Swiss-Prot record:
Gene3D superfamilies: 3.40.630.30
N-acetyltransferase domain mapped to chain residues: 2-140
High-level lineage: Bacteria, Bacillati, Bacillota, Bacilli, Bacillales
Name of the molecule in the record: Uncharacterized protein YdhI
CDD domains: NAT_SF
GO molecular function terms attached to this record: acyltransferase activity, transferring groups other than amino-acyl groups
Source species of the chain: Bacillus subtilis (strain 168)
InterPro entries: Acyl_CoA_acyltransferase, GNAT_dom, N-term/lysine_N-AcTrnsfr
C-alpha cells in the first residue's frame, strides 16, 4: 500500500536524505543547469511505514512543464506511473501545452518507461553529459549496465 502526497507535505530532511541516498546529492545536473530536487515542486509515494518509495520533481515555466527527476525504489509496481500521472494532472491544471524531460542514453529502463506512456523523442544532445559533469563531477562516466553515460535525450508529450 502506498499514498501519493505533495513534496511540501514531507519533512524537508526526508527529501534531502532520499536524494542523497539515491543520487549522492539532492542536486540534479543536466545541461540546462543544476536543480535542487529537495526544493522543487513534486510528489512522493510513501509506504505504510512512512518511507519514501518514489519521488517525482518538476518545474512549470509558462506553457512547459519539465520533469526534473523521477525515482521509484520498487519497479513494476505502478509507483512511477502514479507519480507521473500526478504531474501530468498538475500540468493540465496549469494550462501547460507539453511536458518535457531529459534522460541519459544509458537509462534504458527510463527510455522504455516514457515511450510506453506516450512520450516521444524530441531531440538528442550528443555529449551533453560532459557539460552536466562539469557542473556535477560526481556523475559517473559509465553506468552500472556498462553503457557510457554520454548523451542526453529530450522526451516530450503534448498535453490534450
Amino acid at each position: 500500500m502506498m499514498i501519493i502526497i505533495p513534496n511540501n507535505e514531507i519533512a524537508k530532511h526526508m527529501l534531502t536524505d532520499f536524494f542523497a541516498k539515491h543520487w549522492g546529492t539532492p542536486e540534479m545536473a543536466i545541461s540546462s543547469g543544476i536543480f535542487r530536487c529537495d526544493e522543487l515542486d513534486g510528489f512522493a509515494a510513501v509506504n505504510e511505514s512512512g518511507e519514501i518509495i518514489g519521488c517525482i520533481t518538476y518545474t512549470i515555466d509558462g506553457k512547459d512543464c519539465e520533469i526534473i527527476s523521477l525515482d521509484s525504489m520498487i519497479e513494476n509496481k505502478g509507483i512511477g506511473t502514479a507519480l507521473l500521472q500526478q504531474v501530468e494532472e498538475k500540468a493540465k491544471h496549469a494550462h501547460c501545452q507539453r511536458i518535457k524531460l531529459i534522460t541519459t542514453n544509458d537509462n534504458v529502463n527510463a527510455i522504455a518507461f516514457y515511450q510506453k506512456r506516450g512520450y516521444q523523442f524530441a531531440a538528442v544532445f550528443p555529449n551533453a553529459v560532459e557539460k552536466a559533469r562539469r557542473l556535477k563531477p560526481e556523475i559517473p562516466e559509465v553506468a552500472e549496465n556498462g553503457i557510457l553515460i554520454r548523451d542526453e535525450i529530450l522526451f516530450s508529450k503534448v498535453i490534450d
